[in-house]
């Protein structure tokens, strides 16, 4: 009698094509990692892998060539450094990106990215989604990265300790690329989590696996989806 292999995807782990080896993805909100955390990742890679780390286009890190028996210990080592992999793979809210490093006001964007990760990473209400769900935060429209996110947050105003964001949704790349569309304008930061939760509930309830949010928006139509 054969036993199905465990599904580690929600813990940020994929089985490699090479037999008996696994990849561990580590979420880094806004692509930021401390020196101490970087040392931990390097130590884990050297001790359990082949001493190399891959950097992803979404600001995460991947450690390859890991053995299944070592995965629990690796998870503990990463957690001690304040690092999480929960939701880095599979049908979950993936790592929160921010392509606006170095611009004025980036610390506030990084802080929001960390808030979003704390809220959604490992939150059972928003796991086992039809497909991955990507969120990005940007200081402006210049890089157009907000157009390829499931939810793109673009800073519209920041003064007097008040940050307002335009919310773009339903973008994505892949075989059928689609630009996101403007969903809501000038939303206060304190409402962002509630709005994303509402979008996720609609997505989870109406999108058939393995469809992304862009397919649901296309099926409903932008106006109907927004309503």
Each predicted region: which residue ranges?
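Glycine-centered flexibility motif
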Residues: 8-12, 20-23, 31, 90, ...
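Mobile "lid/hinge" segments at catalytic clefts and subdomain interfaces of large enzymes
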Residues: 127-129, 133-226
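Small-residue-enriched alpha-helical segments and adjacent helix-cap loops
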Residues: 2, 16, 21-162
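Intrinsically disordered, low-complexity polar/charged tails and linkers
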Residues: 1-15
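General structural signal for secondary-structure boundaries
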Residues: 1-3, 34, 67, 188, ...
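Residues that form generic nucleotide/phosphate-binding pockets
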Residues: 77, 115, 119, 202, ...
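Flexible, active-site-adjacent loop/turn segments at secondary-structure boundaries
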Residues: 6, 94, 211, 215
């Amino acid at each position: 009698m054969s036993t199905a292999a465990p599904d580690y995807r929600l813990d940020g782990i994929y089985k490699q094509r090479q037999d008996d080896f696994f990849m561990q993805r580590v979420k880094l909100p806004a692509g930021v990692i401390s020196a101490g955390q970087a040392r931990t990742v390097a130590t884990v890679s050297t001790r359990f892998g082949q001493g190399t780390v891959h950097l992803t286009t979404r600001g995460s890190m991947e450690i390859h060539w890991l053995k299944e028996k070592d995965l629990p210990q690796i998870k503990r080592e990463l957690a001690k450094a304040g690092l999480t992999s929960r939701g880095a793979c599979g049908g979950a809210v993936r790592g929160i990106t921010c392509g606006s490093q170095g611009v004025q006001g980036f610390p506030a964007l990084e802080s929001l990215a960390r808030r979003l990760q704390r809220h959604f990473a490992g939150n059972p209400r928003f796991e086992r989604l039809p497909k991955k769900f990507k969120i990005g935060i940007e200081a402006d429209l210049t890089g157009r990265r907000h157009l390829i996110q499931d939810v793109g947050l673009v800073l519209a105003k920041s003064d007097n300790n008040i940050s307002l964001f335009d919310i773009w949704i339903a973008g994505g790349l892949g075989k059928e690329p689609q630009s996101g569309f403007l969903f809501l304008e000038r939303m206060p930061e304190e409402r962002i989590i509630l709005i994303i939760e509402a979008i996720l509930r609609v997505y989870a309830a109406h999108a058939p696996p393995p469809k992304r949010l862009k397919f649901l928006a296309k099926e409903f139509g932008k106006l109907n989806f927004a309503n």
